[in-house]
From Swiss-Prot:
Disulfide bonds: none annotated. Signal peptide: none annotated. It comes from the Bacteria. InterPro entries: YaaA. Pfam families: H2O2_YaaD. Transmembrane segments: none annotated. Belongs to the UPF0246 family. It comes from Rickettsia rickettsii (strain Iowa). One of its GO terms (cellular component) is cytosol. GO terms for biological process: response to hydroperoxide. This is UPF0246 protein RrIowa_0836.
Length: 248
């Protein structure tokens, strides 16, 4: 089984990461192509296309301009935000972290896909951002889908567990994915309707990654006992391709 999660806008390059063997992102050539486009933008253009403040545009302009000399950090330790904070990465054993290295991918607008220990530099680029004529979802779709197919071909249980947001999981082409896609949903009953509450769903996704790592889980079936923040598996609302957890 291979799980996917979204990258995060929030980064943490201040806190030191544990010493571990680092790896290199697989699509650096394509990353450099995107960087060339990003480096051509003015601060004002970055502010507009990314819908960010002038201050953030300045920070990212400086990052892109001197990208090669920026500090590097393992992706799983560099990203912050609700998903990553609830993985509690700093508490994972080396064994659990090594398991994630072969069973988790982080979807990124700049890097395409990242293994947890792939080194990244500080950046901001959401998958929905349009760069000139480049649609990032289309830009990455074939490369990412083919890469996932290659990884799953070597897995014992050939499932792709989708814990990413729709914005990022859209980079997977279902028509070219050779193996079973299993989507995970975290729902809450609000006024008689089942709804996804973003912040709670993000926390639950991170907690599920933590459970996968700590228990070496390689099958969606083994996740049905997952419970966090009051979520519980709903047989009624689930199917072979959809795992639905409802908050009581």
């Amino acid at each position: 089984m291979l799980a996917i999660i979204s990258s995060a806008k929030t980064l943490n390059f201040e806190k030191l990461a544990p010493k571990t063997e680092l790896t290199i992102p697989v699509f650096l050539t394509l990353t450099n192509k995107l960087l060339a486009t990003l480096q051509s933008y003015s601060e004002n253009q970055l502010s507009k296309i990314m819908n960010i403040s002038a201050k953030l545009a300045h920070i990212n302009k400086e990052r892109f301009k001197d990208f090669d000399n920026q500090e590097s950090k393992a992706a799983i330790f560099a990203y912050a935000g609700d998903v990553f904070n609830n993985i509690h990465i700093e508490k994972l054993t080396n064994h659990a972290l090594n398991f994630l290295q072969s069973h988790l991918l982080i979807i990124s607008g700049l890097y395409g896909v990242l293994k947890p220990l792939d080194t990244i530099k500080p950046y901001r680029l959401e998958m929905a951002t349009k760069l000139n004529e480049i649609n990032l979802t289309n830009f990455w779709q074939d490369e990412v889908t083919n890469y996932i197919n290659k990884i799953l071909a070597k897995q014992e249980n050939k499932y792709l567990l989708n814990l990413a947001s729709q914005e990022y999981s859209s980079v997977i082409n279902p028509n070219k994915l050779k193996y079973q896609l299993v989507n995970v949903h975290f729902k809450e009953n609000r006024n008689g309707k089942l709804s996804t509450i973003g912040i709670n769903a993000k926390k639950a996704r991170g907690a599920m990654v933590k459970v996968i790592a700590n228990n070496l889980i390689d099958s969606p079936e083994l996740l049905k006992n997952f419970s966090y923040l009051g979520y519980a598996f709903s047989t009624k609302h689930s199917s072979d391709n959809e795992l639905v957890f409802i908050k009581s």
